[in-house]
């Protein structure tokens, strides 16, 4: 409720938290609220895979930031900027930890002064490839409203992936079960005595195991 109220009232706010804390649910609720208020909403993410995931969880089309800002490769610049801003009332950016300085600056220039911006991300996940730690620096600045979700919900607690993520974040060794033992877990460990063996194992997983289990290696990795 606090996150929804913040998003409804602030021009810029950050929603952050570790895996399983409800960022996805909260984002979906905020988008639904804005939609009910009649706002024109743009959903975006730094990568295509993250944009696809955002679209799946919100039920609304999402795109990459480059596509949202209409990147022109012939001129190596974005068409959308302060002179030609986005025709929206609100913007949601997921996986904001991957925002670098250039992309963040370009995005902010293209958002109308009256529009709202929600940045969603986890500073402990993938950082930007380019220069800058935009999300982390904004959080540390204490100049932007931040809602940090900390409670891990019951369904997430049952996930070994979530448990291992928190263990690693706290400097502890993760619990890894061998694939050969075939335990009922969502996090399996495939050891290899030599680097070459590891490469062959990865090839076998991508080419054989994943398709056999119904996963698309291109989209799922």
Q: What role is predicted for each listed range?
A:
Residues 26, 30:
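Hydrophobic positions on the alpha1 helix immediately C-terminal to the Walker A/P-loop
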Residues 38-39, 88, 113-116, 142-147, ...:
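Short glycine-/polar-rich loops that comprise or flank the Walker A/P-loop
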Residues 8-15:
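Pre-Walker A (Motif I) flank of P-loop NTPase domains
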Residues 23:
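Conserved lysine of the Walker
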Residues 20:
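Walker A (P-loop) phosphate-binding loop of P-loop NTPases
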Residues 2, 6, 123-221:
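Conserved helicase motor core of P-loop NTPases
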Residues 40-45, 49-110, 151-152, 161-162, ...:
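Conserved P-loop NTPase motor core of helicases/translocases
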Residues 101-115, 133-138:
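Short, conserved "post-DEAD/DEAH" coupling segment immediately C-terminal to helicase motif II
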């Amino acid at each position: 409720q606090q996150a929804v109220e913040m998003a409804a009232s602030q021009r810029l706010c950050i929603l952050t938290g570790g895996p399983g804390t409800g960022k996805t649910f909260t984002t979906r609720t905020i988008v639904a609220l804005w939609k009910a208020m009649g706002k024109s909403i743009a959903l975006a993410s730094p990568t295509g895979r993250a944009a696809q995931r955002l679209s799946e969880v919100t039920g609304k089309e999402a795109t990459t930031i480059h596509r949202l800002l209409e990147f022109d490769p012939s001129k190596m610049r974005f068409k959308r900027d302060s002179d030609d801003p986005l025709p929206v009332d609100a913007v949601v950016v997921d996986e904001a930890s991957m925002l670098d300085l250039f992309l963040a600056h370009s995005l902010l220039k293209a958002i109308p002064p009256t529009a709202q911006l929600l940045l969603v991300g986890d500073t402990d996940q993938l950082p930007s490839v380019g220069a800058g730690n935009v999300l982390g620096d904004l959080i540390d600045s204490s100049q932007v409203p931040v809602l940090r979700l900390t409670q891990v919900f019951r369904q997430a607690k049952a996930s070994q992936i979530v448990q291992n993520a928190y263990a690693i974040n706290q400097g502890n060794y993760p619990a890894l079960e061998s694939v050969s033992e075939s335990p009922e877990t969502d996090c399996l460990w495939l050891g290899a005595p030599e680097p070459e063996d590891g490469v062959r194992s990865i090839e076998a997983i991508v080419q054989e195991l994943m398709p056999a289990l119904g996963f698309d290696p291109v989209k799922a990795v």
